[in-house]
A protein has these predicted regions:
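Carbohydrate-recognition beta-sandwich/jelly-roll modules
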Residues: 161-166, 182-439, 521-522, 531, ...
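Active-site-proximal substrate-binding groove within the catalytic cores of carbohydrate-active enzymes
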Residues: 334-344, 406, 564-746, 751, ...
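Short strand-edge motifs at loop-to-beta-strand transitions and within beta-strands
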Residues: 61-63, 125-129, 324-326, 771, ...
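Active-site neighborhood of glycoside hydrolase catalytic domains
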Residues: 503-597
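Extracellular and organelle-lumenal recognition/adhesion modules and their flexible linkers in secreted
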Residues: 16, 22-212, 222-224, 235
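The substrate-binding groove and active-site-proximal loops of carbohydrate-active enzymes
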Residues: 374-397, 477-514, 519, 553-568, ...
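Active-site-adjacent "subsite" loops/lids of carbohydrate-active enzymes
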Residues: 412-518
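C-terminal beta-strand-rich structural cap/linker in extracellular carbohydrate-active enzymes
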Residues: 767-793
Length: 793
């Protein structure tokens, strides 16, 4: 795997890493700060944000920075903050350093944060946001925020540090002195992240470096291999490491395969290119896709995770050294001295789509479609209560309150759980008086003393922050006035824990007593990416219960911790392992999302969304995001719920939403403006208004999704990049005009091909291999190359 020559040249790479790279420090002066919403006051060199007793007040300060980067370079934003008076609790985005980016190409990245605790006992704390941009940045907006909480907080010493030394390149965000580094054999490098001046060192398989031992089992496969990796600490202390596997690329024109519609040619001196997204932990971001791919002269090379054995990872291509690499951020601790995971190396042809097809062939279980029928998602509401419910295409029911009726009418019923959360309502004795986290803690301890299972699970599972405090916060929502406690979802925590209380053996035996399809059809996992859950859990008592590797914090200490994305993966994987043998399914809200390993264990994905803003202006999801969700779902159903004000979401908006769904074979659905009240399907005046749209478009979504999306379109090509074409099964193609104007597009297909069109009707002929369609903005067409099939209605 790595010969002597490889070790020698990797040593050259390691030696080329430099410390003390030149930085420009920009102090964010208070005179340049602008008010955010209700603003701030100044006390000397400090910013003061005082919300008083108003829990709805939003205030803070904001700076605008013009960066105008010619190449992507990392920078850090830092401030210090303390709470003088607040409700208590642990770190929250409501009290944070917050950074938004606008790239030079106009794209954006919102909401990278360093969070603080609204707890006066914490004193001054530093918060740092490390930005590792995927492409050059035009500008950044930096916020010091205190939103939706009572009390008063202070910020001081805000500053930005930017790497500006012209003769430096970056290798996985580490400065590298430019030079003609020779190409080398593939192999591993390791860096000790807790040492700021530490570079990469080669580490041989079966050998040691920087106090860790590396073991690798290689399983060759057609056009590639799978590597099972174990990293073991030999020092007995906390560790924060980045392990890199680097694969040299041959000579030739280099292309970064960014996504199914984007290929980026790279010059030999181009900066590193990656798909990683910021997660607020580790030494860098987390890959959005489960693999990274490049092409050289038309031949493809890719590295990706094994979804059965994931770790926190990113892939990147480094043109100056002609390396494709995969980097793993690994935490090790006395409580968990090893990290075990697996990744794949493979070749392909056909750009990103060919890479995705090749990856899916290596991960057949991850992309397997298990549900026999597909349709739209109904949250909570009894389907039988909807007038002429058959018109809407219901198939998946969130909530098991009418299982017998669902069985009789072909509806798949899912039991609701929400991992990581315990919504604790406070006693009515509190009335309208404000309560604190201390009050909520006292109630939990009282319940635990009485033997309450939820409280006992809290004792074994509650997450801990960097100070060892239990993670929770005061909440006032339509469904709970009290506190939310955040719990580890790991299924193998000893004793009573979150997973075992919410997923008892007795419940599974009862719900799945009879063979499918009789009874409950699966488990519904809400908030599967834990939108309220902190990124890291520092509870050392549960480190050993984790099967997946630890990661580490991105602050100055780089402490080992559990990453919620991997802990939630273990929850979902365990649930799938229990229901699949029973012929049942897993449905999850928020999947596919930001964690590329989670879709592998989800049979029905979906999300709650808003495609209009508060004023009712149309704000659709990007086509990049829509295609990402379809691609990682492959042939599995993906379902939407619009959570909007349905008086503002007009008939035309609903039709446009459904046309977008048809283009990608996704399922349109509706819920509530606040995910609780005013359920769409309790309101005949709105669902009857939209009934014709459901009857027209949902059968098309079903036809396409059940046929199965194909990453490689072999039927039709578009000559206009603004007109998207996607293939489903062997015979269907969707055509969508994303342009803001009507276009006449030339489509190419096999000479003599003919297709029926299922949206507006009629036939499309490719007599000479070309057909022309005139499409209005956001118009969709569905071509069916089997002319004998009637239009579904």
């Amino acid at each position: 795997m790595m010969g002597t020559r490889g070790l020698l040249v990797c040593a050259a790479l390691a030696a080329s890493l430099v410390s003390g790279a030149a930085e420009i420090v920009r102090v964010l002066g208070l005179d340049a700060a602008r008010p955010y919403e209700r603003g701030f006051t100044r006390d000397g060199d400090e910013i003061v944000v005082d919300n008083g007793d108003d829990a709805a007040r939003r205030a803070g300060a904001v700076w605008s920075l013009a960066l105008n980067q010619t190449e992507a370079r990392p920078f850090t934003v830092r401030t210090e903050a303390r709470c003088e008076r607040g409700p208590g609790g642990t770190r929250t985005r409501a009290f944070s350093l917050y950074v938004d980016l606008v790239y030079m190409d106009g794209d954006h990245l919102w909401g990278q944060t360093a969070d603080f605790a609204p707890d006066p006992q914490r004193g001054w704390r530093a918060g740092t946001v490390t930005v590792i941009p995927a492409k050059p940045v035009r500008s950044a907006s930096v916020y010091c925020l205190y939103r939706g909480l009572p009390g008063r907080v202070r910020f001081r010493a805000p500053a930005v540090r930017i790497l500006e030394q012209a003769d430096l390149a970056l290798f996985d965000a580490q400065p590298v002195a430019l030079g003609d580094l020779p190409r080398h054999e593939a192999g591993f490098l390791v860096r000790d992240v807790q040492r700021a001046d530490d570079g990469y060192a080669p580490i041989p398989v079966g050998g040691e470096a920087k106090g860790v031992r590396l073991s690798v089992v290689e399983t060759p496969a057609a056009d590639g291999a799978t590597y099972r990796v174990t990293v073991e600490d030999r020092t007995g202390r906390d560790r924060a490491l980045t392990l890199v596997y680097a694969w040299p690329l041959p000579a030739g024109d280099l292309v970064f395969e960014e996504d199914p519609r984007t290929a980026v040619p790279l010059a030999d001196n181009a900066p590193q290119r990656s798909d990683a997204q910021a997660m607020g932990c580790g030494a860098g971001g987390l890959n959005r896709w489960p693999f990274g791919a490049v092409s050289v002269g038309g031949r493809g090379f890719a590295l990706g995770i094994d979804t059965a054995h994931p770790a926190y990872f990113r892939t990147a291509v480094h043109p100056r050294t002609r390396l494709l690499f995969i980097a793993f951020d690994l935490g090790l601790a006395p409580e968990k001295r090893t990290a075990a995971f697996a990744f794949r190396r493979f070749t392909f042809t056909g750009g990103f789509r060919g890479a995705l097809a090749a990856y899916a062939a290596r991960e057949p279980d991850a992309f397997k479609t298990r549900v026999p029928e597909q349709g739209i998602w109904m949250p909570f509401r009894a389907i039988k209560s909807v007038e002429n419910w058959q018109d809407f295409g219901f198939k998946f029911k969130e909530g098991n309150d009418e299982t017998a009726w669902d069985d009789a009418h072909g509806i798949f019923t899912f039991r609701y759980t929400e991992p990581t959360t315990w919504w604790l309502s406070m006693d009515k004795a509190h009335g309208t008086n404000r309560f604190t986290m201390a009050d909520c803690l006292a109630k939990v301890e009282s319940l635990a003393a009485k033997g309450d299972l939820r409280a006992r699970a809290w004792r074994g599972s509650v997450m801990r922050d960097e100070d060892g405090a239990r993670v929770g916060r005061v909440m006032d929502t339509p469904w709970c006035r009290g506190a939310i406690w955040l719990l580890s979802p790991l299924p193998d925590i000893a004793g009573i824990c979150e997973y075992k209380v919410k997923n008892t053996e007795a419940d599974f035996a009862k719900f799945y007593a009879k063979p499918f399809p009789v009874g409950q059809d699966g488990e519904y996992i809400d908030s599967a990416e834990g939108y309220l859950t902190p990124t890291l859990d520092f509870n050392r008592a549960v480190f050993a219960a984790s099967d997946t590797p630890l990661v580490f914090s991105s602050d100055e200490d780089h402490r080992p911790a559990l990453f919620k994305g991997l802990s939630m993966y273990e929850y979902v994987r365990r649930t799938a392992a229990r229901v699949w043998p029973r012929g049942r399914f897993v449905m999850a809200n928020g999947v596919p999302g930001r964690w590329p390993w989670l879709p592998a264990y989800v049979d029905v994905g979906g999300t709650e969304t808003q495609w209009i803003d508060e004023e009712g202006r149309w704000r659709p999801e990007s086509h990049r995001s829509l295609l990402y969700k379809r691609a990682l779902s492959m042939g599995k159903p993906y379902c939407y719920l619009q959570n909007v004000d349905f008086e503002k979401f007009a008939y035309a908006d609903m039709e446009n939403f459904m046309r977008h769904c048809v283009a990608y074979g996704l399922f349109p659905g509706c819920f509530s403006h606040n995910a609780s009240e005013g359920h769409y399907f309790t309101r005949p005046e709105v669902y009857n208004r939209d009934r014709p749209l459901f009857k027209k478009y949902v059968p098309l979504c079903k036809m396409l999704s059940e046929a199965g999306w194909r990453p490689v379109n072999t039927l039709v090509a578009s000559t206009d990049a603004r007109v998207f074409v996607e293939q489903f099964g062997a015979r269907y193609v969707t055509v969508f005009n994303s342009a803001r104007a009507t276009v006449k597009v030339r489509l190419t297909a096999k000479v003599g091909a003919r297709a029926s069109e299922h949206v507006e009707g009629g036939e499309v002929s490719f007599a000479d291999g070309v057909a022309t369609l005139e499409l209005a903005p956001d118009a969709v067409r569905v071509l069916d190359f089997n002319l004998n099939t009637p239009v579904p209605r």
